[in-house]
């Protein structure tokens, strides 16, 4: 009887883990797509040369080495 309860609890735990792991496991996951981009958008983290800023924007770094893509005047006024 005790063995049946242990097997049931183990099976229930494995099923629960499997259900929790499924939503983010697909190739169309937004987090995976964001990391796979070749360049960084405005105000996103950048690091040259691995992930430069898109559209020749400047990658501006602080003293703490946190680098973000700087907006251009066209970005500020809605031009693309």
UniProtKB/Swiss-Prot annotation:
GO molecular function, one term: calcium channel regulator activity
Cellular compartment(s): Secreted
Propeptide span(s): 22-37, 72-80
A GO CC annotation given for this chain: extracellular region
UniProt keyword S-adenosyl-L-methionine, yes or no: no
The UniProt record lists the keyword Disulfide bond: yes
A Pfam short name: Toxin_9
UniProt-listed InterPro entries: Spidertoxin
Source taxon at top rank: Eukaryota
Signal sequence annotation: 1-21
Domain remark text: The presence of a 'disulfide through disulfide knot' structurally defines this protein as a knottin.
Family affiliation: Belongs to the neurotoxin 02 (plectoxin) family. 01 (Tx3) subfamily.
Function, as annotated: Antagonist of L-type calcium channels (Cav1/CACNA1).
Protein name (database record): U6-ctenitoxin-Pn1a
Organism: Phoneutria nigriventer
């Amino acid at each position: 009887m005790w063995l049946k309860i242990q097997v049931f609890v183990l099976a229930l735990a494995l099923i629960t883990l499997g259900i929790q792991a499924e939503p983010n496991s697909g190739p169309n996951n937004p987090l995976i797509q964001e990391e796979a981009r070749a360049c960084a958008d405005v105000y996103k983290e950048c690091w040259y040369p691995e992930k430069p800023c898109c559209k020749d924007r400047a990658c501006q770094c602080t003293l703490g080495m946190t680098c973000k893509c700087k907006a251009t005047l066209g970005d500020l006024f809605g031009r693309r």
